[in-house]
Amino acid sequence: MKKNVAKTYYVYILECANGAYYTGITTDIERRFTEHKTKNKGAKYTSAFGVKNLMAVWKTKKCDNPKSLASKLEYRIKALERKDKEEIIANKKAFKIIFMNNFEFNSFIRFF
C-alpha cells in the first residue's frame, strides 16, 4: 500500500533584472530557478524582465497540507511593502517579527 507522503514546498523570492522582487512556490527550488533563468517555463513576469538572483528561500516543515501553507505565505509576502521584503531577505529574524501573529507561519524554516 502506497503511503501518502506530504511533499516539501519552498517559498522563494527572486530579484529580477529590473530590480523588482518576484515571489513564488515550488517543490524543487533548483529546477524552478533554472526555469526562471532560462525563460522557457518561467512565469510571465520573470520571462519578460529576467532574473538576477535568488534572494531567499523558506522550506515547509512537516505539516498536513504544505502546499496550502506555502501558498498562504507566498500571498502574504507578495502583499508586503518592498521595505519589509528587503528586511526579511536581509534579516532572518525579521520573518518571525513580521509574521509573529500568524502561528501557522512557524511551520517554515529559512532554507537559503
Give short role names for the model-derived ranges.
Residues 1-41, 50-74, 92-112:
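GIY-YIG nuclease catalytic motif and its immediate N-terminal context
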Residues 40, 75-90:
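Short arginine-rich
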Residues 44:
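Basic, flexible Lys/Arg- and Gly-enriched helix-loop patches that mediate nucleic-acid binding at interfaces
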Residues 47-53, 80, 87:
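Charge-biased low-complexity segments
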